[in-house]
Amino acid sequence: MTLRPGERDLAESLAANALAFLAAEPERLERFLSLAGIDPGGIRAAAASPGFLVAVMEHLMSDEPLLLAFAANEGIKPERVVKAAHALGIVPWERGFA
């Protein structure tokens, strides 16, 4: 996939917003951390991993109500989240998100 200049940066920014969205509600964050196998005390170390933002976006993409809530919170169409996920290298139909 060919990215336009700045597209990956925008996708990473949206993924960081998604993490903040998850962190805003303890239940959301706990579910993400549990499914990702991350201890709450290890979130800072995990966040330094190159794949962390990808994991955040994969989590959103795997839960349609959560994806829709995030998109509404951001004031964007859900398709924008999908495009950001693609820019981060996530191919939804290969991971069962279709």
Q: What is each residue range found by the language model?
A:
Residues M1-A98:
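Metal- and O2-centered redox machinery and metal/ROS homeostasis
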